A protein has these predicted regions:
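Extended, charge-enriched "interface" segments that sit outside catalytic cores
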Residues: 1-81, 85
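Alpha-helix capping/hinge segments and adjacent helical runs
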Residues: 2-5, 9-10, 17-19, 256, ...
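A glycine-rich, basic-preceded beta-loop-alpha segment at the flavin cofactor/substrate interface
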Residues: 39, 241-244, 248, 260-292, ...
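Internal helix-loop-helix
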Residues: 59-60, 90-163, 167, 210-212, ...
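A structural-propensity feature for long, helix-poor, extended segments
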Residues: 154-160, 439, 445-487
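A short core secondary-structure module
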Residues: 199, 203-245
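C-terminal helix-coil-helix/basic helical segment that borders enzyme active sites and/or dimer interfaces
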Residues: 343-394, 490-504, 523, 527, ...
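C-terminal amphipathic alpha-helical interaction region
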Residues: 454, 466-568
Length: 568
């Protein structure tokens, strides 16, 4: 059977990035747990060996259980009866296997029953699972909601809830409502304090809630009477054991069928406040969403890998005009671009996760002791990098997943339109990635300030100073010219001082920045491991050079007066 980790050597390459030594040092507090837990690592090499073993176990379960179950789960899906969700039979098997392997609460401290893993190896597990079944990946990876509870909950909540997630219970984040999708400040689910019971009560409806019948819910609700904006919202913990929430229905979706997307009715449900009042949206949900967006980036890379695998296998097997179709330039052109997008997107994903790891670890240390001036500077640096890279990783990888799924079907020709082939499920599952946890348009909104304040350009210029192999130098020279075009476009838009114009071309600027950053990352990877990445570096540079030229031409020639022609 396939192993979804060992079969993809690029994963081990990214795991062994030099930044991991600093990440492990921070996460393990210089390996202090070894005195208390026999499974805690003794040193850096031991920690890396542990990550490798867990990833191999995840890859094995994915290949032997999750992947074979995927088609049946897609067809059966979950069911709703008496206000509760019943998972598909294959989903139950998948969950049981992951729980038995101890793959829950992976990033949580060992004192709560977790593995104390950094986010990077956990994100790799999420990618691996999504490559086999993106719908199940949603259910399993929602365990990372516990990061938000760990970060903002109190000690009592830590001791009561975190061990349950580490033992295999499930989570959901209940944010959106019928009239509050992207505009979360419009959330109206009502939270009132019950003086008699000394608890909060939740009343209202939530919609489009992934894994909505989970054991523990993080809920965004309006706690401040008379408010209508984000400052009236707080975050609450709802425990399914308390009762008071029913599943009204499971949505009938295009894809990710195994993942129950629910409409929930809160009827005087007992809940407790997480953190401080009024910070639910402006602080806690923002942290929750950043984690979720990294998760969708991982899911997208997994789907891109699955699409490439299916397309490559079919192109090698299918013969037309006396030879395998992979020998035709039209086909190997598609496959090479799919692989290049996959490699570039994965490079961006794990660069982002490493940034997140360092700033999160330093945040956690700051709750134990005062950071040194050097640590505060490091924390500030990586918090900014994580915040700027996350919308790029989510937006670009979700778009690439959709493009690769489209091309996978195209390679299959008429057969790709038939339900017998996995590519149609990959195509349907991929479609949601550029929509949920913030559409690509919202990722652009999150990223555009890093365009206009010069942060992305500064990162690109810093990457230009990193040495590369002689073989990569010509590509790097062309990449400098791409950055110059990006800078010219950025300056034109800033100098215009026209907000509507900036909003109109923001997506193009966002993609130009991402293209330059990913091309640099791929050149760095090709320098270190040419046997894995040299071809993709060439293909990707050719691809994004044309993309940057296209966007540059549009922006530099565009006149703001022409906006009137675009308004519908």
């Amino acid at each position: 059977m396939a192993n979804y980790y060992t079969d993809i050597p690029e994963l081990k390459y990214h795991l062994n990035n030099p930044m991991m030594e600093r990440i492990c040092e921070l996460k393990e507090r210089n390996y202090r747990d070894k005195e208390e837990f026999d499974y805690a690592p003794q040193d850096y090499a031991d920690a890396m060996d542990s990550f490798d073993k867990v990833l191999e176990i995840t890859g094995e379960i994915t290949g032997e259980i999750i992947a074979p179950n995927a088609e049946g789960v897609d067809e059966e899906g979950p069911h709703c009866a008496n206000g509760r969700v019943e998972y598909a039979s294959g989903t139950k098997q998948n969950l049981d296997a992951m729980v038995k392997a101890g793959l829950n609460g992976m990033t949580m401290p060992r004192r709560f029953g977790g593995l104390n893993f950094p986010i990077t190896p956990y994100t790799m597990c999420a990618e691996i699972v999504a490559a086999a079944d993106a719908g199940f990946g949603n259910i399993w990876s929602l365990q990372d909601c516990i990061e938000t509870l760990y970060e903002f909950g109190n000690e009592g909540q830590h001791s009561r809830f975190i061990p349950r997630i580490c033992a295999g219970e499930t989570m959901s984040m209940d944010l959106t409502e019928p009239d509050a999708g992207s505009d979360l400040q419009s959330v109206m689910l009502k939270a009132t304090f019950d003086e008699k019971e000394n608890c909060w009560r939740l009343n209202g409806v939530k919609r489009f809630i992934t894994n909505g019948d989970a054991d523990l819910h993080l809920v965004l609700a309006r706690s401040e009477e008379g408010t209508k904006d984000g400052r009236g919202l707080s975050m609450f913990i709802y425990d399914k054991r308390q009762g008071g929430v029913d599943v009204r229905r499971i949505e009938n979706k295009l894809g990710i069928h195994g993942s129950p997307t629910c409409e929930l009715v809160y009827k005087n449900a007992k809940a407790e406040l997480c953190g401080d009042r009024q910070l639910g949206l402006i602080k806690y949900v923002m942290a929750l969403m950043n984690g979720a967006r990294l998760g969708i980036a991982a899911q997208s890379v997994g789907l891109s890998q699955a699409a490439y695998n299916e397309g490559l296998a079919y192109a090698k097997e299918r013969k037309q005009f006396g030879k395998a179709i992979i020998e035709f330039p039209a086909v190997y052109d598609m496959l090479s671009i799919m692989k290049a997008k996959l490699d570039a997107g994965r490079a961006l994903l794990y660069q982002t996760s490493r940034y997140v790891d360092i700033y999160k670890a330093l945040d956690d240390i700051a709750r134990e002791r005062k950071l040194t001036p050097e640590e505060r500077q490091e924390q500030k640096k990586y918090a900014k990098l994580a915040d700027s890279f996350t919308p790029l990783a989510k937006g670009m990888n979700s778009e690439y997943a959709n493009q690769n799924a489209y091309d996978c079907i195209q390679i299959h020709g008429g057969s790709g339109f038939m339900l017998e082939y996995a590519c149609q499920r990959i195509y349907r599952d991929a479609r949601i990635t550029s929509i949920y946890e913030g559409t690509t348009q919202l990722q652009t909104v999150a990223a555009i300030r890093y365009v206009t304040n010069g942060s992305y350009l500064a990162t690109i210029r810093e990457f230009e100073t990193i040495p590369c192999s002689p073989e990569m130098e010509p590509l790097k020279g062309r990449l400098v010219e791409m950055a110059n075009k990006f800078e010219a476009c950025m300056n034109k838009v800033k100098e215009a001082q026209n907000q509507e114009l900036q909003d109109f071309v923001a997506r193009r600027l966002y993609e130009m920045a991402a293209d330059c950053i990913m091309a640099h990352l791929l050149i760095q990877d090709a320098t270190k491991a040419p046997e894995m990445f040299a071809k993709s570096a060439v293909v990707y540079l050719n691809y994004v050079e044309a993309e940057v030229e296209k966007h540059s031409s549009f922006i530099l020639k565009f006149n703001a007066d022409e906006l009137a022609s675009y308004r519908q």
